[in-house]
Amino acid sequence: MSTVHEILCKLSLEGDHSTPPSAYGSVKAYTNFDAERDALNIETAIKTKGVDEVTIVNILTNRSNEQRQDIAFAYQRRTKKELASALKSALSGHLETVILGLLKTPAQYDASELKASMKGLGTDEDSLIEIICSRTNQELQEINRVYKEMYKTDLEKDIVSDTSGDFRKLMVALAKGRRAEDGSVIDYELIDQDARDLYDAGVKRKGTDVPKWISIMTERSVCHLQKVFERYKSYSPYDMLESIKKEVKGDLENAFLNLVQCIQNKPLYFADRLYDSMKGKGTRDKVLIRIMVSRSEVDMLKIRSEFKKKYGKSLYYYIQQDTKGDYQKALLYLCGGDD
């Protein structure tokens, strides 16, 4: 008989693999899609005195990514100009950031966010960690390919020159996208062994055997690790997250915490990040925008449900309270509705 955990695990896998991406996305392909008509309407909106932002937002947030690529192609055919550069000149501020993000393919978007996180002085570790820890094998492999295409250098090379120590080792191992895929066979012996190894390498000893932690957490499948973290509690007086806080510090601690949260429940991980981006004074718009853009066709409906469950009010409500104008409108369309 399957345990509840196995059933849940199977469900979460189906959410990740066998359902088409749009099943839990808030943005779906537009039914009466006409790229030529959309391109013409956007051209008119850009030429309008003062720019008709509402039309631009309405069209681009209500089309799938694939459809947006078709619109950009049709626009270039019509005007001999690139849609992205035309919109860059026409828009500004956070709205411009959202709209330009929507025009990139998912891999181009992630690649450009990763590049930005490592450009110039200092690294935006937070963005680097979020993207590298939360993407699937397939997504990471595509990001690596596109990154090289866009920047004529390897993602791994940039990570190596921008990070150091065990944090670098963890990021490089994750960025390869070589984690085992979830199989149908559950290896209870290995689950037990991994749980014990994580404990022996950390809480049980003085100092931490970080390479051991890295190899288990970057090589095993998501479903396997969910069970390992459960089993871990029967060896350790602390759960995995508490153990990380006790054992490591700085960027490495932050990266392990993000990774374990992603493995345990990815939609909840993003719900927490969204909440943190809007709580208190001021908004961390970069994080808010990146999650709304990158998850809108993947799992936004799951994120919304986790958000409401944990914070008592809907994601929609929080965005309404925290943003304004056409920027707000764009985010609310990507959110896809109130709960």
From Swiss-Prot:
Any GO CC annotation of this UniProt entry: extracellular membrane-bounded organelle
Top-level division of the source organism's lineage: Eukaryota
Main subcellular localisation: secreted
Domain remarks: A pair of annexin repeats may form one binding site for calcium and phospholipid.
Family: Belongs to the annexin family.
Function: Calcium-regulated membrane-binding protein whose affinity for calcium is greatly enhanced by anionic phospholipids. It binds two calcium ions with high affinity. May be involved in heat-stress response. Inhibits PCSK9-enhanced LDLR degradation, probably reduces PCSK9 protein levels via a translational mechanism but also competes with LDLR for binding with PCSK9. Binds to endosomes damaged by phagocytosis of particulate wear debris and participates in endosomal membrane stabilization, thereby limiting NLRP3 inflammasome activation.
Protein name (Swiss-Prot/TrEMBL): Annexin A2
